[in-house]
């Protein structure tokens, strides 16, 4: 991939045309509308604004993954490199995920947000989540990665299935050598067109953020917080500490600042905050990481895989919420049981990836495996899960972004000049052209 070149001659955008400012204003307006006029906020048409934007983004996720992975692998000289990147990514995911799970346990034990909580459990309210959790099996998860048909994988937007086919297709194209030149050029050109579609769709981000936030506040409202505000605050502060301290230290080891990195991805963070979906920023995130200096093969392999195997925010939530429920129900968990929770959560957090309500399903699976009597206690946190999902999504996005840069650095596939240029100067991505090599 050729070097990024800032469009230095382009005039600076007026502040009201900057995406992150538009999204931020939209979020604030959404909160105001949902709070002051909840009946308007709960309107199906308002909800459709947020849902529609997320669907528009999901529409291009599979093509983005396919083109990025195939183009990246097809230009690699050897298959070993692909395997090496995948192994390093999985090692990183497991280490950092363990840190996230452990942090949730430590904070819950120290602060004890559920101690003295007065609330009611409701087994019926969480019966569906418990049922789905009981049906989760590791072998089913592995088999689910293999699509029944290639068309079905793309049609249903199954990230891991699309990723598997893309890797195989990229390796096959790489093995063709010069005979595959025309197809490589086609995929590269298709990538440009797809990212052009994304540039159009992202312009609707403020509308989507407004609709999603207005509905969330209008539907659940501040009254949904009640005496669970302590748990929400604990989770948000714990996630913030994880990003600033844990990811910050990891970033510093690789030679970049976590604060500059967060500034660089501010547009994506605000889109995720507004939509409560980390997938809503996946295509833009992949494009930005390439501009940051990460090689195309690393971005194509690490980011989509991370959306299933590197869910730092979800991991923190699982252990923190588990202990909160136990404390609220006056159930003591021994040190051994807490270690078991950590080990079980490492498995269940992968088993429900891509499933709607995955955070709650994995929580049910973890509780059922360790102390089944705690499953009805999930009803305590059911009402605030929408507010928690925003923090989970934000933390997951930060974790996957840092993971990609770290794996690229570890593999020697990180362009330091691009990294410094993007972070130190905070180049506006819309003022940068990315050229993809076709040969």
Curated annotation (Swiss-Prot):
Domain of life: Bacteria
Membrane disposition: Multi-pass membrane protein
TM region(s), chain numbering: 18-38, 56-76, 91-111, 157-177, 193-213, 231-251
Function: Responsible for the transport of dicarboxylates such as succinate, fumarate, and malate from the periplasm across the membrane.
PANTHER family: AEROBIC C4-DICARBOXYLATE TRANSPORT PROTEIN, PROTON/GLUTAMATE-ASPARTATE SYMPORTER
Family: Belongs to the dicarboxylate/amino acid:cation symporter (DAACS) (TC 2.A.23) family.
Name of this protein: C4-dicarboxylate transport protein 1
Organism: Bradyrhizobium sp. (strain ORS 278)
Gene: dctA1
